[in-house]
């Protein structure tokens, strides 16, 4: 009788399923607060409110005022802004979303090439064109309409030219 080497045996035994991981999509931006505002309106999300944490750290002298700003009517981080799903949990101390979340971080350069990753926005049935008009009113642009055998969608760009699709 032959024995299976331990390495081969380990490969054939079912592996335990890993614990699901949380994640956020981080998007480079020249104006993170404007982008968070656009995407919050586009998706029906909330702009994260980090002002209690920012104010507390400023009062304690833990951070310089130069890394903060006023945006959306409150104190915020200068180089970061996020939009989060209104039904998802968030940390009450920092205001940071713990669920579906888009985080915009300031970078010095504008977008120069096609996205390698993009967002698909799903409109209500029969409402795609009306939704495209609404998004254009918020600052998006229509780049093209795609009609293929597998489906139809509108390719759009947000105010900083990040492509996304509207189904």
Task: Briefly describe each language-model feature range.
Residues 2-8, 14-20, 24-27, 37, ...:
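Vicinal oxygen chelate
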Residues 32, 128:
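Aromatic/hydrophobic pocket-lining residues that form the small-molecule binding cavity
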């Amino acid at each position: 009788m032959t024995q299976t080497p331990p390495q081969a045996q380990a490969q054939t035994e079912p592996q335990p399923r890993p614990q699901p991981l949380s994640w956020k999509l981080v998007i480079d931006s020249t104006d993170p607060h404007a982008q968070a505002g656009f995407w919050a309106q586009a998706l029906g999300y909330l702009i994260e409110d980090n002002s209690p944490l920012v104010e507390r750290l400023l009062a304690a002298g833990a951070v310089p005022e130069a890394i903060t700003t006023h945006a959306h009517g409150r104190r915020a981080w200068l180089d970061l802004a996020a939009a989060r799903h209104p039904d998802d949990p968030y940390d009450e101390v920092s205001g940071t979303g713990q669920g579906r979340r888009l985080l915009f971080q300031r970078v010095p350069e504008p977008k120069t090439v096609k996205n390698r990753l993009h967002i698909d926005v799903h409109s209500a049935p029969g409402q795609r064109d009306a939704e495209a008009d609404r998004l254009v009113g918020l600052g998006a642009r229509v780049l093209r309409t795609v009609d293929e055998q597998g489906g139809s969608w509108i390719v759009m760009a947000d105010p900083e030219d990040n492509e996304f699709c509207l189904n």
